[in-house]
Amino acid sequence: MTVLLSALAALLVGAGSAGAAPASIPAPAAAPAPALALTAGTPCAASADACVDLSSQQAWLTDGQGNVTYGPVGALGGTRKYPTPTGTFSVDYKDADHVSNLYDADMPYSVFFAPAIAFHTGSLSERSHGCIHLGKTASKRFFANLSPGDTVQVVS
């Protein structure tokens, strides 16, 4: 019996040093990427302060923690020639009485969040040159509630 155990021990010890490749141990699986938390009822991240869905032509104000505070409201973006950019942006500045120097157009209650792109009062039946048109009541609310540095997310 002792000889049998010694032979078995020699086989086990020698297997790792006899040039045979050790049995590979699978690496632990990478953890799946955490799902992006969305603001309920919107297609935008919970961290956004304003959300625009170009396909449904809606916009919302949120608290940046996943709760809608205003909306949905009608929101109309740009044309094919002048599309509204999608992505995540920061509010740059606000101008209640802005007049476009590019299109000589009044843009009341403008909240700029991308170069030459803003939320502002505008037609909900005529597309913009890339901005987000809101009705007057909604544009006043967006103007009052958004501040430079706030996050705006635009999805298509």
Predicted regions and their residues:
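Intrinsically disordered, low-complexity
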Residues: 2-90, 95-97, 154-156
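Exported/periplasmic cell-wall-interacting domains
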Residues: 34-49, 79-88, 93-156
